[in-house]
Amino acid sequence: MAKKRLHSFSWVPDLLHQKDNYFLTPVEKLAEKIELIANCPQVVYNQGELCSCTANAIGESIEYILIKGKKAVFAPSRLFIYYTERRMEGTIHEDAGAMIRDGIKSVNKEGA
């Protein structure tokens, strides 16, 4: 019988950074409704019990941007993103989740 995992790691909240910028817009300027489905990737990934939610979100975002921009589409390696973001955080030997900021930095530096 398979053992149930007892830990509940997932997304790790980002720490505030002096370079953070906040985007605010008046509510009246926002569209009432937008349709995003046309640009969504067709494959839905199941990360199972792996705590790689930030890597999956980043990989899906990359695919979305490529489809929307009518660029050559590829499936970014979610495991590579997960590994490199944990390497930045010093947790490569743990299934510890990661900060989305580190995932984005890792894609910028290492690729996907």
Predicted stretch roles:
Residues 1-112:
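Catalytic-core signature of thiol
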